[in-house]
Amino acid sequence: MNNTIKTDVLIAGCGCSGLYMAMNLPADKKILMITKSDCESSDSFLAQGGMCMLKCEEDYDSYFEDTMKAGHYENDKKSVEIMIRSSADVVKDLVDCGARFAREADGSLAYTREGAHSSNRIISVSYTHLTLPTNSRVQIS
């Protein structure tokens, strides 16, 4: 019996980061996503649709400190900087792909404060995993 699976790209993890990576790979690639248990056990699912976004430059230092503190200062500082600086572009990409984030009456993104964050920088959707598009070239196992 041959249990070999052939794929162009293997992604470990089926949370938002894994899905975002899959969405940004070339369309001709066959993608296999694997998870250690089930998709409903991912941190993205458990976060109930919330994700952080840098609202303005004045919030950067506080956002950076909150993230470092939440990671017990074991985080890679350059990775944290990249995550924070790219957050608005990631949100734009997700909106362009159909993610529906909560909005204020004027149409702007609605921000809340959760977890270790010292200010409102969490945007959310109900059940993020249901609003991020996938397609037939992505297999989740």
Give the location of each predicted region.
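A short, basic/flexible loop-to-alpha-helix module at the beginning of a structural domain
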Residues: 1-4
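N-terminal Rossmann-like FAD-binding beta1-loop-alpha1 element of flavoenzymes
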Residues: 9-32
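Glycine-rich FAD pyrophosphate-binding loop
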Residues: 28-45
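A short alpha-helix-loop-beta-strand transition element characteristic
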Residues: 44-45, 74-81, 91-109
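Glycine-rich active-site loop/strand segments that organize a redox cofactor
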Residues: 53-82
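Terminal amphipathic helices with adjacent charged low-complexity linkers/tails
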Residues: 104-127
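Conserved small/polar residues in nucleotide/adenosyl-binding loops
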Residues: 128-134
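Hydrophobic alpha-helical segments, chiefly the membrane-spanning helices
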Residues: 138-141
